[in-house]
């Protein structure tokens, strides 16, 4: 399970050093793709395969599933982290998430998310006030 907030920097070659606590789970390979709210999702390869299997199970006639699959898979980039725990974020994904040098990498249960630092701070400012209200709808009875 991926937890926590980390603040690495993107190097001049578009590489990110993965947080040390995430490296073992991601060492076998990752898939980086577009996420919602203009962040990037980083999945361990087996988790990405699980999601791919779920999408494959949707009927081809399901318009929303087709649209989601197109964006999700067309933007995906698979890679094995190097010995230093680095992965290269392709230019089209850096552009999508408006990534600058200063990043925020968060653990989000079964995936890792990569955010531009300013975008993450803005997202938190908008979302934290509603956090208590959202909990009851997402986790009733907690």
Swiss-Prot record:
Residues in SpoVT-AbrB domain copies: 5-47, 76-119
GO cellular component: cytoplasm; nucleoid
Entry superkingdom: Bacteria
UniProt GO molecular function: DNA-binding transcription factor activity; transcription cis-regulatory region binding
Main location per the UniProt record: cytoplasm
InterPro entries with a match to the protein in the record: MraZ, MraZ_C, MraZ_dom, MraZ_N, MraZ_sf, SpoVT-AbrB_dom, SpoVT-AbrB_sf
UniProt keyword Ribosomal protein present: no
Keyword Cytoplasm listed: yes
GO biological process, one term: negative regulation of DNA-templated transcription initiation
Name the record gives this protein: Transcriptional regulator MraZ
Gene: mraZ
């Amino acid at each position: 399970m991926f937890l926590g907030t980390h603040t690495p920097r993107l190097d001049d070659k578009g590489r990110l050093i993965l947080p040390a606590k995430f490296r073992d789970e991601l060492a076998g390979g990752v898939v980086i793709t577009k996420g919602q709210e203009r962040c990037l999702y980083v999945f361990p390869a087996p988790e990405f395969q699980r999601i791919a299997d779920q999408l494959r199970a949707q009927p081809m006639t399901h318009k929303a599933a087709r649209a989601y699959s197109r964006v999700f898979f067309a933007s995906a980039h698979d890679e094995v982290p190097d010995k230093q725990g680095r992965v290269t974020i392709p230019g089209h994904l850096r552009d999508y998430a408006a990534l600058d040098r200063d990043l925020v990498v968060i653990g989000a249960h079964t995936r890792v998310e990569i955010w531009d630092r300013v975008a993450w701070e803005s997202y938190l400012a908008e979302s934290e006030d509603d956090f208590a209200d959202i909990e009851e709808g997402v986790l009733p009875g907690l």
